[in-house]
Amino acid sequence: MQSHIFSAVLEADQFEDGAPAFHAWCPALKGCHTWGHNQQEALARLEEAVELYLDDLRAAGEPIPVDPERGVIALSSPAVVVNL
């Protein structure tokens, strides 16, 4: 089992209707981004988006990107990541 840790960017934004929002994305995964009403929601949605993105890569036979310079770390054992 491998664990992958992806760096995320989270910034204040707004929805199309002007309501406050947070935009979250992973720089190493082109096009993998989402929004939420608060930071926690945006990060939770990003976690789901990353899982779906990686599922699509695996289904297509593509490798999961590993590039520490772009914020992607692979570990050869299970890991727990805690955001504080």
Model-derived regions, located:
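A short, exposed loop/beta-hairpin motif centered on an aromatic-Gly-Thr core
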Residues: K30-E41
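ATP-dependent carboxylate activation and anion-phosphoryl transfer catalytic cores
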Residues: Q2-I5, E16-D17, K30
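ATP/adenylate-binding site constellation spanning eukaryotic-like Ser/Thr protein kinases
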Residues: C26-L29, E47
